[in-house]
């Protein structure tokens, strides 16, 4: 008895030379309704993504070397070491992989079988089957996946500015803490001088022991405040080190101008500029386009794919017979025409459009809140600098001189000193609010340069409609 053996070899499927290559930049989104024209995302400083493996093993900057002092140095360290950016870049690579996979053609299926293994009527056959995808389903699926790629690219841009916002906030918070230490040192010096004057007057019989004790308490309070301010300096340095993703980095005295002049912004123009410049609406538009492509993909799903099978069969016997096998199969969309998924895809488009509107409204609200904080703190800073602080400092100097000559009581000097303390601290807090507002506005506008200058969007001259406001003249 002659036996026939059908052997299956290991096949290596090699991509055709004309296979579609992955573009470095995804093509512009396709939106079927009027709206903001979409453009490719702006470039983000990063390492090449030719090989996805290095995304998870990129070396971190060394902690040794020059201690950063300027904001630009801290930003550079953060962009090279922050895990948020590495995660966002890896998400882009993952989305690109899904887009490549979406258009890969189904693999052929090979089979070998024998309905009857032994005997003079034994049969041996081998077949090859292939699914032929119709109606451009693979192309539509890849187009939807490409929108996810572009959405991930916009999210990388947003992640980068999130990191910049954290670094900028931590940087100027530490700068404010440095200024607080300087103020508390000044107040401690004032308290020590007041204590010395009170002690001398008590020894001369012009003061009392109670006066000396009061000034001793004020001196001790000023010293404790200085110690506490030093604690905030240390914690602020650790927060800044964490913001650049180098928690053990050594941070010294920062080199920046806390009193730098900043521009004013017009609210309506700023809100429009934020919606245009921010990456969140662009990512939402990418999601709308993805939903539209998914609707087209769902619409062609009922069109059946074709399954074609061909093969060879050998029947052993007398006489032996060679036969060819052919089979064509397809699904008949009689009951399931993908009605539910089509309905769901249409709802996803409506939901995505609503999400875009929600994002635009939230950004406009954030811009209004940031401008409110920024304008009020800016006005406070200007008034403290020009009018309030000079008066408070002059009051303390005059009161100290009068108290040394015994012309005023210690209560008057104490009150003047407290006014100066409250004024100096309020001035510092106004500076902190001013810089927080500037950081928030720059984050919403996604400004590369910080602090913002006169070339930033929505900047106006800081002039009131009826002229600048000034305090009332003294009576």
Residue spans for each PLM region:
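Acidic, low-complexity, intrinsically disordered peripheral segments
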Residues: 3, 7-10, 14-42, 426-475
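Small/polar, glycine/serine/threonine/aspartate-rich low-complexity segments that form flexible
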Residues: 24, 31, 55-68, 108-144, ...
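Short segments within alpha-helical structural elements
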Residues: 39, 46, 159-160, 224-246, ...
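Amphipathic alpha-helical coiled-coil scaffold segments and their short linker/junction regions
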Residues: 73-79, 207, 211-221, 246-308, ...
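A glycine-/polar-enriched beta->alpha junction
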Residues: 76-86, 93-107, 126-144, 153-161, ...
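Alpha-helical coiled-coil heptad-repeat register
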Residues: 82, 89, 96, 103, ...
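Short, charged, amphipathic alpha-helical segments
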Residues: 143-146, 209-218, 410-418
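Periplasmic alpha-helical coiled-coil/stalk elements that build and connect Gram-negative outer-membrane
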Residues: 158-275, 370-373, 377, 420, ...
């Amino acid at each position: 008895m002659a036996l026939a053996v059908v052997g299956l070899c290991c096949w290596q499927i090699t991509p055709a030379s004309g296979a579609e290559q992955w573009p470095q930049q995804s093509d512009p989104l396709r939106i079927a309704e009027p709206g903001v024209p979409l453009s490719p995302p702006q470039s983000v400083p990063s390492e090449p993504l030719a090989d996805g493996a290095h995304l998870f093993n990129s070396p971190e900057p060394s902690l040794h070397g020059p201690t950063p002092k300027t904001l630009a140095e801290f930003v550079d360290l953060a962009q090279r070491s922050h895990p948020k950016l590495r995660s966002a870049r890896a998400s882009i690579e993952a989305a690109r992989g899904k887009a490549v996979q979406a258009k890969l053609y189904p693999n052929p299926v090979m089979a070998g079988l024998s309905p009857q293994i032994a005997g003079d009527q034994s049969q041996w056959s081998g077949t090859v089957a292939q699914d032929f995808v119709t109606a451009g389903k693979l192309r539509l699926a890849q187009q939807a996946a490409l929108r996810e790629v572009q959405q991930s690219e916009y999210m990388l841009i947003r992640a980068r500015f999130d990191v910049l916002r954290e670094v900028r906030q931590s940087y100027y918070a530490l700068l404010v803490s440095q200024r607080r230490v300087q103020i508390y040192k000044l107040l401690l010096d004032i308290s020590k001088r007041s204590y010395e004057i009170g002690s001398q007057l008590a020894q001369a019989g012009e003061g009392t022991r109670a006066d000396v004790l009061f000034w001793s308490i004020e001196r001790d309070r000023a010293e404790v405040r200085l110690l506490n301010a030093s604690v905030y300096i240390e914690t602020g340095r650790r927060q800044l080190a964490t913001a650049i993703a180098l928690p053990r980095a050594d941070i010294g005295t920062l080199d920046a101008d806390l009193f730098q002049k900043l521009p004013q912004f017009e609210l309506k123009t700023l809100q429009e500029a934020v919606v245009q410049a921010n990456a969140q609406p662009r990512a939402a538009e990418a999601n709308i386009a993805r939903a539209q492509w998914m609707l087209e993909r769902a619409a062609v799903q009922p069109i059946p794919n074709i399954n074609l099978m061909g093969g060879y069969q050998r029947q052993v016997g007398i006489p032996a017979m060679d036969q060819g096998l052919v089979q064509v199969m397809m699904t008949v969309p009689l009951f399931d025409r993908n009605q539910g998924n089509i309905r769901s895809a249409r709802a996803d488009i409506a939901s995505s459009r609503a999400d875009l509107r929600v994002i635009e409204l939230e950004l406009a609200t954030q811009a209004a809140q940031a401008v409110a904080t920024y304008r009020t703190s800016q006005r406070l800073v200007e008034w403290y600098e020009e009018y309030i602080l000079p008066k408070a400092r002059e009051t303390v100097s005059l009161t100290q001189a009068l108290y040394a000559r015994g012309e005023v009581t210690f209560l008057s000097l104490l009150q003047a000193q407290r006014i100066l303390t409250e004024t100096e601290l309020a001035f510092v807090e106004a500076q902190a609010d001013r810089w927080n507002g500037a950081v928030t506005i720059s984050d919403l506008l996604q400004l590369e340069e910080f602090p913002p200058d006169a070339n930033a969007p929505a900047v106006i001259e800081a002039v009131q409609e009826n002229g600048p406001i000034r305090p009332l003249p003294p009576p």
